[in-house]
């Protein structure tokens, strides 16, 4: 299973005390393939370093980069699907380039993808993805 994880979802999941932590743990341990691009990775890094402990941020980024289960993509096409927040296009573009099964986000800006026939991107909330990966582990 391949997934692109929205920055805010990844941010809450890297905290070991968060109930969403399995999203991060399963990404680096092979529960699913985390799909990232350089622009997503840079956004993760920027947000993490601003919002959490610097060491935790650096460790999380390194874990994602060096995990053999992380798949890196360099989207060649910008589909410009997220008109409400064009900065979020990097996530949908990566999901399309990766052929990801899911784009995981609680952000309403991605609702437009539910109405887009092509290219198709399945957006699911963090809670649903969490339940999916937890049930897969059991």
What are these regions (language model features)?
Residues 1-18:
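Metal-dependent nucleic-acid phosphoesterase active-site entry motif
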Residues 89, 108-138:
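Acidic, PIN/NYN-like endoribonuclease modules and their adjacent C-terminal/linker elements
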Residues 33, 69-71, 122:
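Conserved beta-strand segments of alpha/beta enzyme cores
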Residues 69-103, 108, 112:
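Active-site neighborhoods of divalent-metal-dependent phosphate/nucleic-acid chemistry enzymes
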């Amino acid at each position: 299973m391949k997934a692109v994880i929205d920055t805010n979802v990844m941010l809450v999941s890297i905290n070991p005390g968060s109930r969403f932590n399995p999203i991060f743990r399963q990404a680096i341990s092979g529960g699913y393939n985390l799909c990232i691009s350089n622009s997503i990775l840079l956004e993760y890094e920027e947000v993490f370093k601003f919002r959490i402990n610097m060491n935790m941020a650096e460790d999380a980024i390194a874990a994602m980069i060096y995990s053999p289960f992380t798949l890196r993509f360099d989207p060649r096409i910008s589909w410009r699907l997220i008109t409400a927040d064009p900065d979020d296009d990097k996530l949908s573009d990566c999901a399309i380039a990766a052929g990801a099964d899911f784009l995981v986000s609680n952000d309403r800006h991605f609702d437009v993808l539910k109405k887009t026939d092509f290219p198709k991107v399945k957006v699911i909330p963090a809670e649903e993805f969490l339940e999916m990966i937890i049930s897969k582990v059991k």
